[in-house]
Every structure is written in C-alpha cells, then in structure tokens.
Amino acid sequence: MSGHSKWHNIQGRKNAQDAKRGKIFQKISRDLYQAAKAGDPDPANNAQLRLVIDKAHAANMPKKNIDRAIAKASGIGGAKFEEVTYEGYGPGGVAVMVSALTDNKNRTASAVRSAFSHSGGSLGASGSVSYMFDRKGLIEILRDDLDKSEDDMLMDALDAGAEDMKATEEKFQIFTDPSSMTDVRDALQEQGYELDTAEVTMIPQNRTEVPADKAKQYRHLIDELTENDDVADIYETGILPDEDDDEE
C-alpha cells in the first residue's frame, strides 16, 4: 500500500510538473508569435525574437515548437490568427483582462465567457476594466551573479531611457513607455546586461485582495483561462490571501 502511495505521489508531482511546463511552453509560443508578427520572422533581424528564442531554449522547448510558432506568424500553414482582448470581473470584484491569439473568435469568446461564468465572475464590455491598467514596457534582469547596487542599476536604466525601476530579491524590474521599450532594451543589452524579459504588458494601477471565501473560485478562473490554448496573457488585479495555501 505504501509503495502504491509513493508511486501515486511521484506520478502526481510529475503530472503537475508536466502541466507547469506546458503552460510555460504555451506562453513562450505566444511570445514567439507576437515577436515574429511585430517584426521580421528571421531572428537575425529581430532582436526581440532572438530574446524569446533564447528563453525557449532555456526552458528546453523543442525546436519544432519554436519553428511552429514562428511559422504561424509568417502565415505558413493557412490559418489566420488574430489578437483579441476580453475584459471582465472575477470573484471578489477582481479586474481581469485576457489577451488571446485565435483563428476562431467565436470559439475563444465562448470559452473565455464560460471560464468567467464557472467561477462566479462576469465578462464585461470592451473598456470595462482596461482603465484600471497602464500599458507599459517591462524589462526584467535577474540579480543572480549581477554585481550591481540598486542605485547603480537605476542610473543605468534611466540613462537607457527607462521611466522607473523596482527591485525585488530576485530581479530588477524596469518600466518604460511602450513605444520606447525596444530602444531601452537595446541600450541595456549594449551595456552588457542579460535580459530575462522584455515585453509590453499591462500593469495594474491598484491591487484587490481576494476574499478568503472567493480564493478557490478565483484560482479556478485563472487556471481555466491559463489552460485555454488560445489565451496568451492574463492581466489581473487580484492578491490571494496568505492563508490560501492550505490544501495541496
């Protein structure tokens, strides 16, 4: 019995790791598509695409997955993909924006609407929550083995054209105007910095603490959206309560 239980636990951890890896690959695939679509599908002529490809390699993403995502952006394969955004409120009044990449808007809209409905949330009209977010360029640099003080990093970021910087224990987060993100990225790379992230994203102006009795529903909403193959990014204002780590 104990042997079966041990195998079950190991298998459960493996399944969880596989699911996590799948979500990482999904996000990288969307980033590859967007980078290739916004610029040249040849990484030799597209610095943003090279950065995402490096991230894909670091995550051990298979080459065929990388090539497939870039091929979609190049129009190879026939399907036409569109970027669409959905807005709504999740459990506890949390504002949620969903960015999707789809070849069938009806299918995607139905799936996103169902995810909100299943969790007790509601899908809203365009503009219903987007005003609660700021569109910003975000560049992240890991602090591991980086011999830089916060003040020195801030000065380098500002000299490169950044607007602001936030430091955590793990990384420096550098914020830019969306239109200047690529210029700041290039300037930092020229200074010798290795970038972990360089993208345009949506930053919440304020955070909403999810009530403890809504935490499970909120997590279900985010999980269901994340598992949707069409969903590229999820932006939300929610903060889960600390005590919502009780069940595995």
Swiss-Prot record:
It is found in: Cytoplasm. Belongs to the TACO1 family. It comes from Limosilactobacillus reuteri (strain DSM 20016). GO terms for biological process: regulation of DNA-templated transcription. This is Probable transcriptional regulatory protein Lreu_0552. One of its GO terms (molecular function) is DNA binding. Coiled coil: none annotated. Transmembrane segments: none annotated. NCBIfam families: PRK00110.1, PRK12378.1, YebC/PmpR family DNA-binding transcriptional regulator. One of its GO terms (cellular component) is cytosol.
